[in-house]
A protein has these predicted regions:
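C-terminal catalytic domains of large/alpha subunits in multi-subunit enzymes
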Residues: 1-202
């Protein structure tokens, strides 16, 4: 790590000097030209943080995710019997692979909402759950009804072929949809992922 004055030191030495195994950093970005309190107002729902210019036509791919949850009243175990995603992404070149990409994204979003978490040992800064024995991911028994709806779209503004990237479109809103479904079922607004049993205990 190099300081502005040119001095440098190895990260391992800094960790040792601090007596800490983990360093966390939190940062906020305020677009150029926006007032300094824009982010705080945005958090409070008092303003919309909009900056930058773009052509008049919006050419992004879009999706909306819907989730049904069942929560055991005794154990607070959360199950997801149904995932539905509706997507529009321009001209689809290969329906089969596009559907598979979106379906796996829905499952991944559910996984990040309820299971996945990288755990660190604070003393050594080493990953505790570094293999699939300890890092939780969904298995077939965790995935029930997954429905992908692909809406037709002709977009000649995006590019001459009218195609758009799917990428991670399937998982973008899924964990938020899971959290909203949990809130609807329990009245508890959970703002940290993954949502664990202890978050739902009274």
């Amino acid at each position: 790590m190099t300081a502005p004055d040119g001095r440098s030191q190895k990260l391992a030495e800094l960790f040792d000097a601090l007596g800490a195994g983990v360093i966390e950093e939190y940062a906020e970005f305020i677009p150029e030209g926006a007032p300094a309190d824009s982010v705080q107002k945005l958090y409070g729902g008092k303003s919309t943080l909009v900056r930058g210019t773009q052509r008049k036509q919006v050419t992004f791919a879009f999706g909306a995710e819907f989730v049904e949850v069942r929560i055991n009243t005794r154990t607070r175990e959360i199950r997801v019997p149904r995932l539905v995603g509706a997507f529009t992404a321009g001209r689809i070149m290969n329906t089969r692979t596009a559907r598979s990409q979106l379906m796996s994204g829905l499952v991944w979003g559910m996984s990040s909402a309820l299971l996945e978490s990288t755990e660190f040992d604070a003393a050594s800064a080493r990953t505790v759950n570094r293999d699939l024995q300890d890092y939780l991911v969904p298995v077939n028994a965790d995935v029930e009804d997954v429905q992908v709806i692909m809406l037709p779209e002709v977009d000649s503004f995006a590019n001459p072929a009218g195609v758009k990237g799917l990428g991670e479109l399937g998982n973008v809103g899924t964990n938020a949809a899971v959290a909203n479904a949990v809130y609807h079922a329990t009245g508890k607004r959970i703002r940290a992922l993954p949502i664990r049993l202890e978050h739902l205990m009274d």
